[in-house]
Amino acid sequence: MLDERIYESYIGILKEEMVPAMGCTEPIALAYGAARAREVLGKEPEHITAKCSGNIIKNVRCVIIPNSGELTGIEAGVVLGAVAGDPSLNMEVLSKVNESGRKRCCELLDKKICKVELLDSPVVLHFIIEMQAGDDTVSLEIKYDHINVTKTVKNQEVLLDSDHKSEETSVAADRTLLNLEDIKTFADTVEIDDVKEIIENQIRSNMAIAHEGMTGKYGLGIGRIIRETYSNDMLTKMRSLTAAASEARMGGCDMPVVINSGSGNQGIACSVPLIVYAREMELPDYVLYRALVFSNLLTVYQKQYIGKLSAFCGAVSASCAAGAGITYMGGGELSVIKKTIENTLANIPGIICDGAKISCAAKIAASLDAAFLAHHLAMNGQSYAPYTGILKEEAGETISCVGQIGKEGMKETDKEILRIMLERV
């Protein structure tokens, strides 16, 4: 059995990470910040400046904002949040936007009231919303987490200043307690009632948007094409539904997703494949619940080394967790689960993140293919030897090294990706 402190921390991590969000999380964060700033200002802004870190710009530039009438870009997210967002709804801040709000947003965008500036900051998730109306001004800063307001100033008066927080301390539960052995023990022994509500919400929400992605018109229709092109086997069903969910989300669908590590795509990738597998295999609900607990915590564990935003594609981490979760559901012992992780990370640790967009769905499909291959290799007793490439003696060490590559080694890559994305022909 786990120490009570570890048990409660893991429950806390799941509750903090597995929250509903509507649309891609970076534009939603901007909309939330703008809605909060407008609330402090107390009136409609006449001028707005959005100062954004490079990773915020990268992840907002190409993605459709939900409930916007298919608008894209930082200006649209900020202005829509300012005129029609409800900050009390957190990551669902745009869920109540109506036609009047969309119309007013377009009017203000036509007047070009919002300008965007690159914020030179060592913090990858960092932006400042500045608003002005008449003689009144507001500046609101968000850092580290998508709705973590660290500073608010109105008319030169500081209303809030909590910049002592970091990415690690802006949340309550202690993520440093995460490790593979305890994650497995927790998944095996957790009281189902302690996690049932959040797990069932993830199943319900993420499968709903998966089916919407299969039937609706979003992006390239990748889910349908996968289903129609390949044999109707387990992997095809997992890849098609998971990719469809991502494509719908990136394509502006207003249905909520239960996220993981601040990302809807990661929440989708670490859950939908397991749900499909469990239903196809007709496994009991409790087996799926425990596997989803395992997969979600394994995703968080990997991301604590990489950070919420980087040049490293988060679909790899979440798909790696999904593959390990399938091994867990298939009765694999911890040693076999570790082999699944190592086999995945030996294959696809080099996928870059070039921003949130509909092609994220294709990256998820490719990553799941690698993860399912890793699962089958491990279940057949096969794994790559330690020190094959970046692999270490233990899967936990390999996860740490991959995180080091993503967080430190790819910093210059991240800058170059942003430079290329911002080039104009």
Where are these regions (language model features)?
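Acidic-glycine-rich active-site phosphate/pyrophosphate-binding loop
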Residues: 1-11, 44-58, 233-252, 285-302, ...
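A structural signal for small-residue-enriched, beta-sheet-centric alpha/beta enzyme cores
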Residues: 2, 21-25, 55-59, 63-66, ...
